[in-house]
From Swiss-Prot:
GO terms for molecular function: ATP binding; cyclin-dependent protein serine/threonine kinase activity; protein serine kinase activity. Signal peptide: none annotated. Keywords: ATP-binding, Kinase, Nucleotide-binding, Phosphoprotein, Serine/threonine-protein kinase, Transferase. This is Cell division control protein 2 homolog 1. Probably involved in the control of the cell cycle. Residues 5-297 form the Protein kinase domain. GO terms for cellular component: cytoplasm; nucleus. Belongs to the protein kinase superfamily. CMGC Ser/Thr protein kinase family. CDC2/CDKX subfamily. InterPro entries: CDK (IPR050108), Kinase-like_dom_sf (IPR011009), Prot_kinase_dom (IPR000719), Protein_kinase_ATP_BS (IPR017441), Ser/Thr_kinase_AS (IPR008271). Forms a stable but non-covalent complex with a regulatory subunit and with a cyclin. Phosphorylation at Ser-15 or Tyr-16 inactivates the enzyme, while phosphorylation at Thr-160 activates it.
Length: 301
């Protein structure tokens, strides 16, 4: 391993390893080297890493970061990925949160293409957020960090609901849903779409309850007509009986769409697409394939 890849600099640190910019000495190509430390030889490779490897080996698409090589030693696992210049969060920070409408549309198209490809192959990403979307020098956007990804088959298995960084977590997951499918990723896509427009996270909650409250303030307190499955989740009774959830919060999104200048970048079609991604009822959210057919993608900016 050491002979083929020369580490150049540390570029990131995840929950179970360090990422380096490195050079493939045999080809002189710059790569990203994810080095995963194995806690003990008996424990072996972390299941998150095995999951990522098995998923990425199957996923070959222009909008998904490519796994080039896997090297395994007694106490270390190295995953070699194509190298990408930066992630979407850094890209937005560099632009001071001011992305132009054409860039937002192109990134959104790429994001949905990558998600559609995953979902067609029965893979949930489950942790879509700007730091997990990588941008190449040519401004191509690709999905990365499938550590939480899970092949879902028939989406009725019990999954852990502790997935997706809080700000991108759907209301059904916040209420403890463990039987979810592709709509959990679609909610995250909607949050990212809004963030690209306004230059800041749409729902920057401090905890689960605060997160849900921010969603209610933006979209309005849902009724059982708007969200039929609302009372069926494990935490529904506990969470929704809190005093702050008893008041009827009027939706502020209409007002914000009209008065927040950043939303004008999306145009009426973009706002309509955003609404269709951020639906309370999971089954009412557009699929990635449906979203790609939305008129927003025919608008010329």
């Amino acid at each position: 391993m050491g002979s083929r890849y020369q580490r150049l600099e540390k570029i990131g640190e995840g929950s179970y390893g360090v990422v380096y910019r490195a050079r493939d000495i045999t080809t002189d190509v710059i790569v990203a080297l994810k080095r995963i430390r194995l806690e003990s030889v008996e424990e072996g490779v972390p299941c998150t890493a095995i999951r990522e490897i098995s998923i990425l080996k199957e996923l070959r698409h222009e909008n998904i970061v490519r796994l080039l090589d896997v090297c395994h030693s007694e106490n270390r696992l190295n995953l070699v990925f194509e190298y990408m210049e930066m992630d979407l969060k850094k890209y937005m920070d560099r632009a001071s949160g001011n992305l132009d409408p054409a860039t937002i549309q192109e990134f959104m198209r790429s994001l949905l293409k990558g998600v559609r490809f995953c979902h067609e192959r029965n893979v949930l990403h489950r942790d879509l957020k700007p730091p997990n979307l990588l941008i190449s020098r040519e401004k191509e956007l690709k999905l990365a960090d499938f550590g939480l990804g899970r092949a879902f088959g028939i989406p009725v298995k019990k999954y852990t609901h502790e997935v997706v960084t809080l700000w991108y977590r759907s209301p059904d997951v916040l209420l403890g849903s463990t039987q979810y499918g592709t709509p959990v990723d679609i909610w995250s896509v909607g949050c990212i779409f809004a963030e690209m427009a306004i230059g800041a996270p749409l729902f920057a909650g401090k905890n689960d309850a605060d997160q849900l409250l921010r969603i209610f303030r933006f979209l309005g307190t849902p009724s059982s007509q708007v969200w039929p499955s609302m009372n069926l989740y494990p935490n529904s009774t506990n969470m929704l009986s809190k005093p702050e959830f008893q008041q009827n919060l009027i939706a502020t999104c209409d007002e914000q769409f009209q008065t927040h200048p950043a939303y004008a970048k999306l145009g009426p079609q973009g706002i309509d697409l955003l609404r269709r991604l951020l639906r309370y009822e999971p089954g009412e959210r557009l699929t990635a394939a449906q979203a790609l057919e939305h008129p927003y993608f025919s608008v010329e900016f």
